[in-house]
Curated annotation (Swiss-Prot):
Native source organism of the sequence: Candida dubliniensis (strain CD36 / ATCC MYA-646 / CBS 7987 / NCPF 3949 / NRRL Y-17841)
Family: Belongs to the TRAFAC class translation factor GTPase superfamily. Classic translation factor GTPase family. EF-G/EF-2 subfamily.
CDD domains cross-referenced by the UniProt entry: EF-G, EFG_III, EFG_mtEFG1_IV, mtEFG1_II_like
Pathway(s) it belongs to: Protein biosynthesis; polypeptide chain elongation
UniProt-listed GO biological process terms: mitochondrial translational elongation
Occurrences of domain tr-type G (ranges): 66-347
Name used for this protein in its record: Elongation factor G, mitochondrial
Main location: mitochondrion
KW Nucleotide-binding (keyword) present: yes
Function recorded in the entry: Mitochondrial GTPase that catalyzes the GTP-dependent ribosomal translocation step during translation elongation. During this step, the ribosome changes from the pre-translocational (PRE) to the post-translocational (POST) state as the newly formed A-site-bound peptidyl-tRNA and P-site-bound deacylated tRNA move to the P and E sites, respectively. Catalyzes the coordinated movement of the two tRNA molecules, the mRNA and conformational changes in the ribosome.
Length: 761
């Protein structure tokens, strides 16, 4: 008898997995109830299935899909995403006036609707809106999501990309590819999202789009080539040249709303031809049709170039690069045209769900973007609104109507769609129905982020896979200043339901409520929101690192739990071995001859889960352990599920402590940018923290250092950096990996833990 318990911890899943669309958080070869199921691993394989689905689509469904784009705006923090989105809304007529991030008019950008966002000048929550864009006498409907750039709010990017078909990656013309740009690229790959790239801030001193494109090719490892050349640079930026059709585009009017076409300036003609040749050459490397034209020495037509860009972009083999300045109102309209020309419509993306079988197994099923098919939708984001919980839903198949009923797949409950809205930041507009490929929101539904809904009476029980949720790396204790903590509990319940990376638990030993998250800013924002939205002042403890415990060598165990001193006894014996593994924790049994009944083995698996939550060394979670039980013994009277669960606890501790255990600490990727004159101070500061410098890039005015530092050493770093750079330096942190602590640190942590435990007795 063999049973395997998987998925207890997912911290060490490879971060560069290529995941199938919407079966999008299991690996390309997935084990479902011990049945191996092959899914498409490349877009070419996906395209075969997509073409088969499209052959059976009705003309109305094809027409609706052709005019629809679901896109996200993603980038490193301060690259200008929200400013870019504000221009998109203005040029599409969605808003009547432009307001800046942290603007002087106290209005702020439309998509940053929280007071905290407008005060701090950062995006905290992803905000959804929709708009229309006219091109070639056709009107296209965009569902648009602006996402945060700060790594602490990475879950907002995850859930946006989870339901989008394409994205605009915004890159700073001065800083180029930065740490969070790499993170966003990894997230796009995780969900197979094609992108067009916009190099922003071309009006800034030191802007260099060609260096940025080189970095996209080198650091993001995706072929990229410019489809535009800037007219002027820095403060003299006037417009761009479209190198495909060789036309100069100038933004005119008080807010760049008018586009004037003209001949290419004489001094740019040679550069345009050089970049056009490079574009064609790059496309020939990633597109077969363009390769044939290129090898035959022919000059491709404008339509052939555009078609090749579209095929290669949707196939995730290439990203076209545009350039301009959102703040200076230059080049935005060209990006909107490129969204239409090069990013996929819903019927060009393969969306896969899992059909639940009667025997409990799951079978992949490809969804059809048709409004006549049974409804399938995913709740990808929850938000507390003025009328109760607001649930954002992506419709993958069928249509959703106001007043209709749908079934919550996880619970089987029938729920009524009492109100259906399209969101425009924090404003909402009621609609009667939405079709396949659309994004909408509804009220009054009790669900969690990642839950699937299907149409009432649908024969197939289909579920969509959930999004990737990174592990929390930092924790702190929190308590309300007043004893009346009803509002405090309500806030805790709401926020952890809305944000999967915000975790709350009660420590029974310290009698404290502990909150965990992605970084100091992440937790600071929630503490501030509890105060503002619930009127509860909180006392917080010092931030604590979320350590992990692991083993380094195999260890055998033979443990007997025996309590036979009169009355009902307890007896359970387990024999086996424990091994270190690099993947998630794993529990396995290989019992021959039924020496231990199945119900007791299940109790052993529960005991294993118990032990993972609190390791033997310092009480932190355990990582990378494979526990195998291959023998044991029962007592005809005294054996029970409790006895074997307790025996597993003892065996785990015995084997763990004999396996040369280590304490792991989070290592962060740190990127610091500051003026060149402070380079020595910054490098010295990182060395003082015990950091390892990986790369240094010097620009005309600023330099950027990338390093690896332990999270524990980074507390208070912002204060030290301000002092070292006269307040002119900035930095970003991202979790990189877990690594063993120094022996003296491990010894100190164990001693402190043992001392604290002894004090509680």
């Amino acid at each position: 008898m063999t049973s395997v318990l998987r998925g207890v911890l997912k911290t060490h899943l490879p971060r560069t997995l290529t995941l199938p669309r919407c079966a999008r958080n299991f690996q390309t070869t997935t084990f479902l109830r011990n049945e191996q199921v092959k899914l498409p691993q490349t877009y070419d394989e996906e395209k075969v299935i997509i073409d088969e689905i499209n052959e059976n689509l009705k003309p109305d469904d094809l027409q609706a899909s052709t005019r629809l784009r679901n896109i996200g705006i993603s980038a490193h923090i301060d690259s200008g995403k929200t400013t870019f989105t504000e221009r998109v809304l203005f040029y599409t007529g969605r808003i009547k006036a432009i307001h800046e991030v942290r603007g002087k008019d106290s209005v702020g950008a439309k998509m940053d609707h929280m007071d905290l966002e407008r005060e701090k000048g950062i995006t905290i929550q992803s905000a959804a809106t929709y708009c229309s864009w006219d091109k070639d006498d056709k009107s296209y409907h965009f569902n648009l999501i602006d996402t945060p750039g700060h790594i602490d709010f990475t879950i907002e990017v995850e859930r946006a990309l989870r339901v989008l078909d394409g994205a605009v990656l915004v890159v700073c013309a001065v800083a180029g590819v930065q740490s969070q740009t790499v993170t966003v690229d990894r997230q796009m790959r995780r969900y197979n999202v094609p992108r067009v790239t916009f190099i922003n801030k071309m009006d800034r001193m030191g802007a260099n789009p060609w260096r940025a494109i080189e970095q996209i090719n080198a650091k993001l490892k995706i072929p990229a080539a410019a489809i535009q050349v800037p007219i002027g640079a820095e403060e003299n930026l006037q417009g761009v040249v479209n190198i495909i059709d060789r036309v100069a585009l100038y933004n005119e009017g008080s807010q760049g709303e008018t586009i004037r076409k003209a001949e290419i300036p004489e001094d740019l003609k040679e550069l345009v031809e050089e970049k056009r040749a490079l574009l064609i050459e790059t496309l020939a490397d990633v597109d077969e049709e363009m390769a044939d034209i290129y090898l035959e020495g022919e000059e491709p037509t404008v339509e052939q170039i555009k078609s090749a860009i579209r095929r290669a972009t949707i196939g995730r083999k290439f990203t076209p690069v545009l350039m301009g300045s959102a703040l200076a109102n230059r080049g935005i309209q060209s990006v909107l045209d490129s969204v239409v020309d090069y990013l996929p419509q819903p019927n060009e993306v393969l969306n896969t769900g899992l059909e639940l079988q009667k025997d409990g197994s799951e079978k992949p099923v490809h969804l059809t973007p048709s409004s006549s098919e049974p409804f399938v939708g995913l709740a990808f984001k929850l938000e507390e609104g003025p009328y109760g919980q607001l649930t954002y839903i992506r419709v993958y198949q069928g249509k959703l109507k106001k007043g209709a009923y749908m079934t919550h797949v996880k619970t089987g409950k029938k729920v009524k769609v009492s109100r259906l809205v399209r969101m425009h930041s924090n404003d909402m507009e009621d609609v009667a129905e939405v079709g396949a490929g659309e994004i909408c929101a509804t009220f009054g539904i009790d669900c969690a982020s990642g839950d699937t809904f299907i149409g009432q009476g649908t024969q197939q029980q289909i579920t969509m896979s959930s999004m990737f949720v990174p592990e929390a790396v930092i924790s702190l204790s929190i308590s309300p200043k007043t004893k009346d903590n009803g509002a405090f509990s309500k806030a805790m319940n709401r926020f952890q339901k809305e944000d999967p990376t915000f975790r709350v638990h009660y420590d029974s030993e310290s009698k404290e409520t502990i909150i965990s998250g992605m970084g100091e800013l992440h937790l600071e924002i929630y503490v501030e929101r509890i105060k503002r939205e619930y009127g509860v002042d909180c006392i917080t403890g010092k931030p604590q690192v979320s350590y992990r415990e692991a083993i380094t060598v195999p260890s055998a165990f033979d443990y007997t739990h025996k309590k036979q001193s009169g009355g009902a006894g307890q007896y359970g014996r387990v024999i086996g071995e424990m091994n270190p593994i690099e993947s998630e924790n794993k529990f396995e049994t290989q019992i021959i001859g039924g020496k231990i009944p199945e119900k007791f083995l299940f109790a052993c698996s529960k005991g294993f889960e118990d032990c993972l939550e609190k390791g033997p060394l310092i009480g932190h979670r355990v990582l990378g352990v494979h526990m195998l039980i291959n023998d044991g013994q029962t007592h005809v009277v005294d054996s029970s599920e409790l006895a074997f669960r307790t025996a597993t606890h003892g065996a785990f501790k015995q084997a763990f402590l004999n396996a040369q255990p280590v304490i792991l600490e989070p290592i962060m990727s740190v990127e610091v940018t500051a003026p060149n004159e402070f380079q020595g101070s910054v490098v010295g500061l990182i060395n003082k923290l015990g950091g390892m410098i990986n790369d240094t890039v010097n620009g005309p005015d600023d330099f950027t250092v990338t390093a690896e530092c332990s999270l524990n050493s980074m507390f208070g770093f912002s204060t030290s950096l301000r002092a070292s750079t006269q307040g002119k330096g900035e930095f970003s942190l991202e979790f990189l990996k877990y690594s063993p602590t120094a022996p003296q640190v491990q010894k100190q942590l164990i001693q402190e833990y043992q001392k604290a435990q002894a004090a509680k007795k």
